[in-house]
Amino acid sequence: MAKKALIAKAARKPKFGVRGYTRCQRCGRPHSVYRKFGLCRVCLREMAHRGELPGVTKSSW
């Protein structure tokens, strides 16, 4: 329940712009969120492995 409240709180516009922060759109995780995708590293990795993110490939060198 607390996570839902924090997700709702993060969705509101803060009084001061610097207080805003990103959350994963899929799971609500507040840390390690990639702005380009709007996903945290965990969800990004899962979706990339399943091929749900177009243009994202596993790198090898």
Curated annotation (Swiss-Prot):
InterPro entries with a match to the protein in the record: Ribosomal_uS14 (IPR001209), Ribosomal_uS14_bact (IPR023053), Ribosomal_uS14_CS (IPR018271), Ribosomal_uS14_sf (IPR043140)
GO cellular component annotations of the record: cytoplasm; small ribosomal subunit
Membrane-spanning segments: none
Classification via Gene3D superfamilies: 30s Ribosomal Protein S14, Chain N
Keyword Repeat: no
Family: Belongs to the universal ribosomal protein uS14 family. Zinc-binding uS14 subfamily.
Functional note: Binds 16S rRNA, required for the assembly of 30S particles and may also be responsible for determining the conformation of the 16S rRNA at the A site.
Quaternary organization: Part of the 30S ribosomal subunit. Contacts proteins S3 and S10.
Protein name per Swiss-Prot or TrEMBL: Small ribosomal subunit protein uS14B
Gene source species: Streptomyces coelicolor (strain ATCC BAA-471 / A3(2) / M145)
